[in-house]
Amino acid sequence: MLGVLKKVFDPNKRQLARLEKIADQVDALGPEMARLSDEQLRQKTEEFKARYQQGESLDDLLVEAFAVVREGAKRVLGLYPYKVQIMGGVVLHEGDIAEMKTGEGKTLTATMPVYLNALTGRGVHVVTVNEYLASRDAKEMGQLYEFLGLTVGLNLSGMSREEKQAAYNADITYGTNNEFGFDYLRDNMVLYKEHIVQRPLYFAVVDEVDSILIDEARTPLIISGTAQKSTKLYVQANAFVRTLRKDVDYTYDEKSKSVQLTEEGMNKAERAFGIDNLFDLKHVTLNHHIQLALRAHVTMQRDVDYVVQDGKVIIVDPFTGRLMHGRRYSDGLHQAIEAKEGLEIQNESMTLATITFQNYFRMYEKLAGMTGTAKTEEEEFRNIYNMRVVVIPTNRPVIREDRPDLIYRTMEGKFRAVVEDIAQRHAKGQPVLVGTVAIETSELLSEMLKKRGIPHNVLNAKNHAKEAEIIAQAGQKGAVTIATNMAGRGTDIKLGEGVKELGGLAVIGTERHESRRIDNQLRGRSGRQGDPGVSQFYLSLEDELMRRFGSESLMAMMDRLGMDDSQPIQSKMVTRAVESAQKRVEGNNFDARKQLLQYDDVLREQREVIYRQRFEVLDADNLRGIIEKMIRSVIERVVNTYTPKEDLPEEWNLKGVVDYLNAYLLPEGDVTEGDLRGKEPEEMIELIWAKVKARYDEKETQIPPEQMREFERVVVLRAVDMKWMNHIDAMEQLRQGIHLRAYGQVDPLREYQMEGYAMFENMIAAIEEEVATYIMKAEIHHNLERQEVAKGEAVHPKEDGEEPKKKPIRKAVRVGRNDPCPCGSGKKYKHCCGRAV
């Protein structure tokens, strides 16, 4: 009964029926296209572009456009896409995932939707897992696109800005996921609009989509740099601040915890550091450090705001009095306190920009992908990326024989059996591909084969181009190839002469991977395009996956039956148990990625706000309007801080307002306490605003307008970049430490969202204050230059080497007792924060 229902309601079947109709329409245009000359075929591209501009949608053009590409492929590449490839192409155009088995021509399938979407002129990105594949596909498929009158770009790491701009301005751009992501981050750090390389993200087709959007989803791309500030400045500023006297050199308001240098204090600083104006732009960093040291000494009290434990400064939660492990004050205040207490100052390696692949690819207007194995992760694709998985049938039926697993007691017994199997197949000339999970396993097998005198190749995903050659030869008579999971992906194994008669390519798996998908990828290397083949997995009860999910009972059973190491069990029950173990691991991994995404979303929203505002700054001709808003909100904040609604007007601290204005916004005497007395806060704000505006106008008259505009831009960019960089760092520290708060029914994610939001608000306020101060107080020089706040390096996650055991970026979920403590002390967890657990 269930089978009948499935037939009627199987959504994949319904999809395929619809796709087949479209493929038939494309197919029907075949003869008509074949009659066109090369020139007429090329003209079609211009005709489509014109029709699109006149309001026809891409869906209206789809059938004809696909037929044109199909004919073009026949003429240029000598390949004519099958009907199933047309169906796959439609799935990609609709922003979904086409699951197509190995050897079914995914690369050719992608040409149709890529061509169609490139007609918009908005740029299509074709994303692959490594640069070798990107270069190969750009070269081979590029011939087809260029024949049809479109331009093709290749985006590789190490290219100059001009080369990258040219690559991105092409209709179609090939590149790796890492490079597209890094370019996005670098574009949001540029100082001039002309230096941006990417256009707005429109449509991406991701090859090996499961590898990039699921296996790599937890790997963040990071551009890091050491901020150009040394710990020396903290020490110097600390020594200077120790010499200052309250109410002479600085003023302190207990209630709002704000502290400011007086005119006398500023003069003292200028004398101490041998400079002429503390508010000169070139002394931004020094000024910042003095302010930090002042706050550390005056507003932060040991054993009230923080404690010192094991040579570390640990923050005390002001509401609960609990220690907030893993949390650091942002913006350098933590380092200033370390200097005050004479502790070792933690050097700041700064994360200048970071994004995960999940969030980068979700920014495309339309995203599509193709792979041989995606159905097992369908739920994740749907929930996170809103993409359906459509399984496209093979052009010819698969006749590969997938044998049930053989399970041995020990690893030693298993490997002996594997080598024996290889030797037998090699003796009759059948090619063998052996898949391993780790590099060590490959090397162990290689040693065993050497002893037996069997010639073989070992691939460890180090050199992509060389590997592609070896993999291409793996189907020749007598070839033996050992490969870690990911090695040579994207390259077909074609069978040599006489191999079909020997049973095709034999694939041997030496261990089940924790993901069924990766096992299926290995199997799928054999039996392509209706070729014969066989796949066999060898397992042992000592394998990691088996150990994780209770192999003890099986071990006991084998002992009872008196089975030795050379006898395997081959049972459906065990194979099912292995599959259910894999399902559990996949479920756990999905949950971990989902949780990571929830944490990451907090930073994503903040990143989008900052990057959008930063672009407005680069793009605007005149920033005065934006800056006036910033100064105004600073004035409102200051007045509201010192004139709280709950206090009587005579209790208001008007001196605090005047001290702040003198220190940061206006020359001394512009606004006095007498001017403010007897006024409502709103009136005070208007009065101060009028004075500030007048001073701003005065500045405008002192230097040429274009220089003033550049000065404004320099100040704003510098403030935004510096504060954002510190903020990313603080958010990372918060995330590392947040799990330690999972006591007393507190939801760590909710805490992270709330604190992250509060920290973001504080950062925006800090940006506004810095901009206001430098616009109003700094002297403007003639040779202004925009400066990077730090030099950035792209930190590459491993290119798809052996499936690296994923290191989740959150070291916070589960800490083993012997692992290094997440608080960063360098001690083992059990000797540090884990003592109490």
Curated annotation (Swiss-Prot):
Its cofactor is Zn(2+). It is an enzyme of class 7 (translocase). It is a peripheral membrane protein. ATP binds at Q85, G103, E104, G105, K106, T107, D492. PROSITE patterns: SECA, SECA_MOTOR_DEAD. Coiled coil: none annotated. It catalyses: ATP + H2O + cellular proteinSide 1 = ADP + phosphate + cellular proteinSide 2. Keywords: ATP-binding, Cell membrane, Cytoplasm, Membrane, Metal-binding, Nucleotide-binding, Protein transport, Translocase, Translocation, Transport, Zinc. May bind 1 zinc ion per subunit. The keyword Translocase applies. Residues 787-813 are annotated as: Disordered. The keyword Transcription regulation does not apply. GO terms for cellular component: cell envelope Sec protein transport complex; cytosol; plasma membrane. Its main location: membrane. SMART domains: SecA_DEAD, SecA_PP_bind. GO terms for biological process: intracellular protein transmembrane transport; protein import; protein targeting; protein transport by the Sec complex. Its EC number is 7.4.2.8. Monomer and homodimer. Part of the essential Sec protein translocation apparatus which comprises SecA, SecYEG and auxiliary proteins SecDF. Other proteins may also be involved. HAMAP family: SecA. NCBIfam families: PRK09200.1, PRK12904.1, secA. Belongs to the SecA family. This is Protein translocase subunit SecA 1.
